[in-house]
Amino acid sequence: MNQMVDMGHAVPAARGLREARAFAPASVANVAVGFDLLGYPLDGVGDTVTVRRIDAPVVRIAAIRGTTVALPLEAERNTAGAALMSLRAALALPFGFELEIDKGIALSSGMGGSAASCVAALVAANALLDTPVSTGQLYQHALDGEAVASGSRHGDNLGPLFLGGLVLCTLERLVPIAVPEAWHSLVVHPEAVLETRRAREALAGDYRLSEFVAQSTNLALVLAGCHASDADLVRAGLRDVLVEPRRAPLIAGFAQAKQAALAHAALGASISGAGPSVFAWFETRAAAAAAAPAVQAAFAGVGLDSQAWVTPINSPAARLLA
């Protein structure tokens, strides 16, 4: 049975630490049917953040390295910095934090790069507190940080990084969704940039009630299918009739990539987060791996190189490294 996570449980910390380092993975948000609600992490790609406790009562970013360096060094304009500013303000901390961010996730890729930096920073900073705070409190500060990147508080990229696996994320709580261990995800990132704000602008305008009914039906089918380990239910529901039609025209090669995944027995395929990355679900790792070349070939057909990852849907959460 799916249960709501205990949002009051604090993450243990070693007292007296002055520096900590944490890793947070990339993630797939929306998952076709749960816009701003559903997400899951990816194994093997993510961001690492080193946080130092400093005497000055400020948050400052000392360095940003890796795949993406064109990010704000001003703490209030950076998701990781803003999250720690929120944490400091809430706890009235007399000390501050200095961050170094090592990016492993491409900018505006639809793979939750801003969320990964944000959560990694919070996990590391929490280890430096004399009394660590709960997962629920960290989540609220992460929502404040993520709002810097997207303009609104939404947790679909954040919740999975705190819990691991598929998570339903409201603004108040995180609910883990059981998924069969054998099910895997293929994520393909074409070497193109689609800014989150532009992707959200594409969603402006009116929607028909029938579209909401269809999307609600699909969400229910996917959740029921996951709960029952019923691939046929998931296959019937893993379709986005609300958001994908408005964003797909912004992604060159998307239609071909989606069709390639479905032709290789995907349970469903859609846009990862705001795009341009594409995700697909499969019943086995072998099936996901077999589909990867065809999906990448679809992007190559429109002149785009790409990277592909095959990971369990039940991939692990962010973790403290040192």
Swiss-Prot record:
What is the protein name for this chain? Homoserine kinase
**Biological pathway:** Amino-acid biosynthesis; L-threonine biosynthesis; L-threonine from L-aspartate: step 4/5
Main location, first listed in the record:
cytoplasm
Report the sequence similarity comment from the record. Belongs to the GHMP kinase family. Homoserine kinase subfamily.
- Calcium: present as a keyword of the record? no
Q: Which residues form a coiled coil?
A: none
Residues the record lists as binding ATP: 106-116
State if Secreted is listed as a keyword: no
Q: Which GO molecular function entries does the Swiss-Prot or TrEMBL record give? A: ATP binding; homoserine kinase activity
The gene name on file is thrB
- What GO terms describe the biological role, i.e. biological process, of this protein? threonine biosynthetic process
General function of this protein: Catalyzes the ATP-dependent phosphorylation of L-homoserine to L-homoserine phosphate.
Q: Which InterPro entries match?
A: GHMP_kinase_C_dom, GHMP_kinase_C_sf, GHMP_kinase_N_dom, Homoserine_kinase, Ribosomal_Su5_D2-typ_SF, Ribsml_uS5_D2-typ_fold_subgr
Q: List localization entries.
A: Cytoplasm
